[in-house]
Each structure stands twice: as C-alpha cells, then as structure tokens.
Amino acid sequence: MHRAGLVRLVRMGLVYLLVAAAAALGWLWHALPGEICLEPGQTLQLPRFAWVEPLRGRGSRNVASTRAVGSYQVTLALGGWLPVRTIRAVVTERPTVTVCGTPFGVKMFSEGALVVGFSDVNTAAGPENPAKAAGLRLGDRVIRIGSTATEDNDAVKQALEAAQGSAVEVVYVRSGEQRQTSLTPVWDASSAQWRAGMWVRDSSAGVGTMTFVDRQLGVFAGLGHPISDSDTGESVALRSGEIVPCEITGCSAGTAGSPGELKGHFLSAHAIGTIRINGENGVYGTTRTHFSGQLREIAFAQEVVTGPAEIWATIEGETPRAYRIQIERVSDADPRRNMILRVTDPALLAKTGGIVQGMSGSPILQNGRLVGAVTHVLVNDPTRGYGIFAQTMLEQAQQAAKTDHAA
C-alpha cells in the first residue's frame, strides 16, 4: 500500500512537471519574436533570451556570416537542443538615420467631420437632438450627409441646410466600420439655421518631437503614437497634414495623476514636411528639408536590453539635450509599448518631473545606437513611461516613402 501510494505521488509529480514545462515552453514561444533582423556577418544572438540559440546541427549559429542578404527560416532551441519556435531571420544592411529630438508643429485635416460633442436645439416643440436620436456617438466620423461628402465643418453645415428639415442619410465610421443612419435636422430660430445638435471638428494641431529623418528616402518619423482628438481620444483619420517649425516656450511639470506638458508655438506657416501616415506607431511623412541631428545606426529590436540609456529631448527653444534614463523592461508582446523607461537624470526631473506631453517621439539611444522613441507617460508616475522600437518606426517610415511614390 505504501509503495502504491509512493508510485502515485511520483506519477502526479511527473504530470505536474510536464504541465509546468509545457506552460513554460508556451510562454517562451509567445515571448520570442517571430522575426529578427541581422546585418551580414552578425551572429544570431538574443540578449534577452541568453539560453536560446539556433538549433544545433541545422546550420551555423552564425546565420548571417555564411549567407547573403535575404530571408531565412531559423529554428530556435533551448540550449541549442530543445526546439521552441521557428522564426524568420532577415539579413540586411544596418540602416543609418539622422537622429533629431527637435520639436515640430503639426497641422492635420481629418477624413470626415469628427463628432466631439452634443447640444440640444431649442425648437418650437421644445429641446431636440437629432444627432443623438439618430444614434450618433462621440468619436463617430461623419463622412457623408445626403449626397454631400463632409470633408470639413462647412460641408456639414451646407448638407444640413440642403436637407431643409427632411430626413437625410448619414454615413459615418465607428471603430473602423462604416455605418448608415437617418437624421432629420431641426430649425433653430435663435440662429436661423437648420441644425443637428452635434459639434464636429475637421482639423487638429499640436506639438511633438521628431525622432529621426532618413535623408536617403526623404522621410521623417515622430511621436511614436497617433495624433488623437483632444476631446474624444480617437485617432484622427488623415485627409491631409503638414509639419511646421516650432519652438518650446515653457513647460508645466508632471506630478502623480497629472501629466505635465511642453508648451510651444509655431515659428512659421511654411510647411517643412507632408504627413503621409498617422498610425498607431507614430506620424510619418516626406520632407526635402534639412534637419539638424546626428547620423546614428538603428539597433535591431532583439539588440535592445534593460539598463542605462539616454533620451534626446527639447524642453526649451529648438535644441535637444541628452538626458539619462534606465530601460526597465523590454518586450515584443505589444508593438506600441516595447519598453518601460524611467528618467534618472536630475536635470530633467527638476525641470519637467520626468516625461511630459510633447516629449513623445524623443529618441532613445543605447550603446551609441538609436533603439526607440518615447511614446507615453505613466499617469501615476511621471518619472516613468513607454517606448517603441526604432526598427518598427523605420518600417513605417519606409511605408510612408512608398505612399508618396504611389501618390
């Protein structure tokens, strides 16, 4: 009986070990990147997964040094023996860009009119709100009313006037999905016009930080996150946009629960670049303007590690300065939040309290290479924030160049 119980315990222990091992391998499979970049002659190493290497017996560990530029399948294994995941290794020349850290102004016009508020219309029958009655919500983007394409606020007004109180079809976009509804404008005697009871916005403006410029392609990358509407938080759907010169004139320091902000103003209405993409990973566009900065290599995503680094930020005037930070965490799981950063530089902490709005796009450098850009501040701890890989931003910038050629 005693022996049978012992055997049962051993079996249960083995089952638990197998389950734990399977869970660990599953976690590792998801944690490993599905694709990595290497330059010719570079050994395939994953500093964040030191115990993982290419499966032995199936090609050289130095994948790049024995092969030409191209794409290859590589099986990664624990200790080189236990296969975990097959990934794609892209062998390419290491890119070099002009790292900036300078402020720029943004002027954008949206694709459609964004609903940013509602207000009842006083009619002879009492307060009414046709927009709400039609089911419209904050953040909806109205792209057509009747036969009128609503590219701006004036077009919305003209379409409502043309309806003359009759029901009209409204085409709008919500969460990326195009929808239709029917709306009946009402007469506002106080303003002598037909109204829908909604406030709309067709443009946006602000200040951000330029991460880098690729002079060879004639493209720029900045912010590290999309330009969003200040009232709804919705990303602005780009119809057209440009960047202009800007200088920082002041700063409100951040505190726990209250993010700070850089204050600036446009120096000129003359555009120095055209925005082509307002995406989840930043603002990208084309430019023929010479931007000041330093030529630096871009670190591939797997080369970014925890430890000391620096950001280039402009908190006064137009000239950036380097400030010390610590990269506390690196992950491939969320393409918009690859790093968690902590400001350690006393000078920056004294002036801004850490990371503030307007610093988004500030370049992050480690071991002399551009590894990423600041994207967001942690609201409850302004000394800490998020960052995105520079490799991701470069891929988006290259897409902006293709968009320009297609146009």
Language model features: what each stretch is:
Residues 76-80, 85-94, 157-197, 406:
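PDZ-domain C-terminal substructure recognizer with occasional recognition of PDZ-binding tails
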